[in-house]
């Protein structure tokens, strides 16, 4: 907003003409779609079984990862969030299973204001311990990036 928020004023819709605002709108739209289309985002919201930290202790690099689970852990989501301006070219994240992890949302896409660098969509976990998990995979984590994987 260009001016202070006021309940009586209309929203500054004209700002959507600026690329940064349009990109943020697209990102929020994608997050809302993720929420509505994946039960792991809401099905077990009232239970700790629906949420699991992968790494909540990487404060030095300001990178955090966690999982959201659906009932029966049939469809799960893995989130990796980088809160720094530094890219991590080979960031390794621990995972619970030796499966394929599909990248379904990437904040580094150009439409969200990212670099637009093309990344592969499928990552295969290997038997390499990381984050206290028996398996892991490496991912090129962009600055201020959020990646969401489905498994």
Short names for language-model regions:
Residues 4, 8-151:
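Carbohydrate-interacting/catalytic domains
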């Amino acid at each position: 907003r260009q001016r202070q928020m006021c309940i009586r004023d209309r929203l500054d819709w004209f700002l959507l003409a600026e690329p940064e605002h349009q990109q943020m709108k697209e990102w929020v739209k994608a997050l809302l779609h993720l929420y509505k289309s994946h039960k792991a985002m809401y099905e077990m919201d009232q239970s700790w079984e629906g949420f699991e930290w992968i790494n909540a202790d990487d404060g030095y690099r300001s990178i955090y990862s966690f999982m959201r689970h659906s009932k029966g852990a049939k469809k799960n989501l893995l989130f990796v969030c980088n809160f720094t301006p530094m890219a991590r070219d080979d960031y390794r994240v621990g995972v619970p299973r030796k499966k394929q992890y599909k990248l379904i949302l990437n904040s580094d896409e150009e439409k969200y204001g990212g670099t637009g660098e093309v990344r592969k969509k499928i990552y295969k976990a290997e038997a390499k311990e990381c984050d206290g998990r028996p398996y892991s995979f490496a991912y090129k984590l962009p600055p201020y990036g959020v990646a969401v994987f489905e498994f």
